Every structure is written in C-alpha cells, then in structure tokens.
C-alpha cells in the first residue's frame, strides 16, 4: 500500500499542485487517513495568512486521495466540496488534515476532514467523490 500511495501522490504533484508545496499523505486504517503540508509564502493571501484557496486545495486533494484508495484505486472526481474556515494558518506552519471516509457506495464516496495547525483547528471540510 505504501508504494501505491507514494506513486499516486507523485502523480498528484503535477500541474497546479506543483505550486503549493509538498503535500504528504498516509493511510491510518481502512477509513482514516492523514495529510500534511507546510504553509509556504506563495500560499498566503494579501493579509499574510494561508489563502482560502490553498486550504480548499489541500482539503480536496487529501480527501480525494482517500476516495481513490477507498474506491479500490479507481479514479475519483470531486462532485461536492464544503469548507468551513475557522482560524488562520500562518507562514511556515505545518497543517495536518485528518480524513474519515464516512460511506462508500458503488459510485460515490462520502468523506470529511478536519485541518489542524499548531494547537488549533484551521478548517473543516466534507465532500462527495464520484467513482469513475
């Protein structure tokens, strides 16, 4: 599994994802996963905190990777993503996302995530992925 996750993560670091830094991902058990990333300067908004689009991107990618694994390594696409921003992420802070696969059907995966910074929750997210 570690090899499969690494290869898939290497693939997700192409294109747009090259711009946000090194997102790591690991499987905890069958329904729990974790992702992490350091907030880089190019991921800040004009107020000097992590841009909401950056937070949404890491949530979508972390939960999407979990959907891919939950779906038996089939491709999945996001059909719904809900983000709630709770506190600010700061420059060089490490963010850790805790992912839970809530339910999987033949064609859909339902997932939630909490994103933590240093001793605080930064955002929560939930979404639905279509299995292709």
Positions of PLM-derived features:
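Terminal targeting signals and extreme-terminal segments of soluble enzymes
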Residues: 1-132
